A protein has these predicted regions:
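Compositionally biased terminal segments of proteins
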Residues: 1-231
């Protein structure tokens, strides 16, 4: 089974477990959603495998987090006491990370999570199951922000950069998606992409995504430049 089909199965499993009362209050995000935002069939087949599902949760404060944990336990999620990731719960053998919009809840967040929740789109995962999905422009912004926090300046080895480049490779409308975003978001994406373009390792990361296909490599760079020069 391809990585994208495995990921869809993972997303469906989590969505079904959450049930109608929780599913619409959470936004699916992260590497497991990359394939849902890609429109190019070739790129879909190149999507990396990831072993966890990420969701943004609209909660404020630690007390709200503990309340959510109790609700999730009823749904079949459990706490793995051996896990170092504070936001992680386990559904059978599947890792599921619930990431709050408020830093006070668990001591971390992503500056774009709150807006990502406010702008999330409905996505029909199956004929009978609809989830809230991060929009492409906020996917890009959250990945850039995540790379700043954990990428250690290594664009070539970063899964965040890999996911980001798969979007630029495989989503034909990504330049228009970002062009229609708020000025703050456009400027942030532009500034971060400029920094990446100045990193010598970034070119190698693009080459890896393009599978050394010169035409695909050129397309990726053209789309990135289109988002940098958005005015």
């Amino acid at each position: 089974m391809s990585a994208i089909n495995l990921q869809k199965n993972m997303l469906e499993k989590v969505a079904v477990a959450l049930g109608d009362d929780l599913i619409q209050s959470m936004v699916f995000v992260g590497g497991c959603t990359t394939g849902l935002l890609v429109t190019d069939e070739f790129t879909k087949e190149q999507i990396r495998y990831t072993d966890d599902v990420d969701l943004i949760v609209d909660i404020i404060g630690y007390a709200a987090w503990t309340d959510l944990q109790e609700q999730l336990k009823v749904k079949g999620f459990s706490i793995d006491m051996g896990e170092e990731v504070m936001c992680r719960m386990i559904l059978d053998n599947l890792k599921v990370d619930f990431m709050p919009i408020d830093e006070q809840a668990l001591g971390f967040t992503n500056i774009w999570y709150k807006d990502a929740v406010a702008t999330a789109q409905d996505y029909a995962l199956t004929d009978t199951l609809t989830i809230k999905l991060i929009t492409p422009e906020y996917f890009v912004a959250t990945k850039l922000e995540a790379y700043l926090g954990r990428g250690k300046g290594d664009a070539l080895s970063s899964h965040d950069i890999e996911d980001l480049l798969n979007i630029f490779d495989g989503r034909a409308s990504i330049v228009d998606d970002i062009a229609s975003a708020s000025e703050d978001l456009r400027n942030y994406i532009s500034d971060q992409l400029k920094s990446l373009m100045a990193d010598g390792n970034f070119e190698y990361a693009v080459q890896a995504t393009a599978r050394n296909d010169a035409d695909r490599e050129q397309l990726i760079f053209e789309r990135i430049e289109g988002c940098i020069n958005h005015d």
